[in-house]
Amino acid sequence: MTKRLDVTCTATGSRPRATLQWTLGQKDVTSNATEQFSHITASDTYTVISDLTYSVGKSDNGQMLTCKAVNVAASSGVQTSITLNVSCKFKKYVFIFRN
């Protein structure tokens, strides 16, 4: 049995525009995400929003879900992670990166 997980990750204040990458454990799940961005002209920075939709099951319990913001100015990236607790009621998480 699987359950749909919806998670949003937001990177603000990037220049140049960041790309958001998703991993679940060691698995790249970025292809399950949609990304949109806006350019803030006054500061010449970008806000990027990535919405991940993924079917998780019991085997995903305890796995680390990571959103990583990367651009040429920060090639090592900035990231945040949560540990999945698949046995509990599902919630929607929102990650916000600020410069």
Language model region names:
Residues 3-7:
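Structural beta-strand segments of beta-rich domains
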Residues 11-13, 71:
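Short solvent-exposed capping/turn motifs at the termini of beta-strands
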Residues 13-26:
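Solvent-exposed loop segments of extracellular immunoglobulin-like
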Residues 16-17, 31, 47:
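Short acidic/polar alpha-helix capping motifs at helix-coil junctions
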Residues 24-31, 71, 82-99:
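Flexible inter-domain hinge/linker segments at boundaries of tandem extracellular adhesion modules
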Residues 34-84:
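Extracellular beta-strand/loop-rich beta-sandwich domains predominantly from IgSF
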